[in-house]
């Protein structure tokens, strides 16, 4: 599971996801990618599940790049605890994903395998995504 080694603060505000992705909106490493079409928070578990689905379908051929990192702690209070008495302890890590952000990139496989693998990975994510391809130069 992905999470930061060290953070400046233990807990973070919830915040909102405004606008579209300006950085990380184009393919930087691979030939094919999976682009987010709506804003949401993606957990470390969801990223890991998508990564496993990708690598399994590719049968360890090619290369995978994960372009999002869960750096935001989400706190949660225990079950059946009364309201108040402070914020809960950090429970999981999430990545804020804006629309247009390339989340995964792959290379070294055919177009068909890439499309199938990224479709399987997209099923593990809580947002609508789109398959993107590098234009031949």
UniProtKB/Swiss-Prot annotation:
Keywords on record: Ribonucleoprotein, Ribosomal protein, RNA-binding, rRNA-binding, tRNA-binding
PROSITE patterns given in the database record: RIBOSOMAL_L16_1, RIBOSOMAL_L16_2
GO BP field: translation
Reported function: Binds 23S rRNA and is also seen to make contacts with the A and possibly P site tRNAs.
The protein, known as: Large ribosomal subunit protein uL16
Family: Belongs to the universal ribosomal protein uL16 family.
HAMAP family the UniProt entry points to: Ribosomal_uL16
Chain's gene name: rplP
Quaternary assembly: Part of the 50S ribosomal subunit.
Lineage start: Bacteria, Pseudomonadati, Pseudomonadota, Alphaproteobacteria, Hyphomicrobiales
Species assigned in the record: Bradyrhizobium sp. (strain ORS 278)
UniProt entry tagged with the keyword Kinase: no
Residues that span the membrane, as ranges: none
InterPro entries per record: Ribosomal_uL16 (IPR047873), Ribosomal_uL16_bact-type (IPR000114), Ribosomal_uL16_CS (IPR020798), Ribosomal_uL16_dom (IPR016180), Ribosomal_uL16_sf (IPR036920)
SUPFAM superfamilies: Ribosomal protein L16p/L10e
Molecular function in Gene Ontology: rRNA binding; structural constituent of ribosome; tRNA binding
Gene3D superfamilies for the chain: Ribosomal protein L10e/L16 (3.90.1170.10)
Gene Ontology, cellular component aspect: cytosolic large ribosomal subunit
Pfam families associated with the record: Ribosomal_L16
């Amino acid at each position: 599971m992905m999470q930061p080694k060290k953070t400046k603060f233990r807990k973070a505000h919830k915040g909102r996801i405004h606008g579209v992705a300006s950085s990380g909106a184009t393919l930087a490493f691979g030939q094919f990618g999976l682009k987010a079409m709506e804003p949401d928070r993606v957990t470390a578990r969801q990223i890991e599940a998508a990564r496993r689905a990708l690598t399994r379908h590719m049968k360890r051929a090619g290369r995978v790049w994960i372009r999002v990192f869960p750096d935001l702690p989400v706190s949660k209070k225990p079950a059946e605890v009364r309201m108040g008495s402070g914020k809960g302890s950090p429970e999981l890590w999430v990545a804020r994903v804006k629309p247009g952000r390339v989340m995964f990139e792959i290379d070294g496989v055919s177009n068909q395998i890439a499309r199938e693998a990224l479709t399987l990975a997209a099923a593990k994510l809580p947002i609508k995504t789109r398959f993107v391809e590098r234009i031949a130069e």
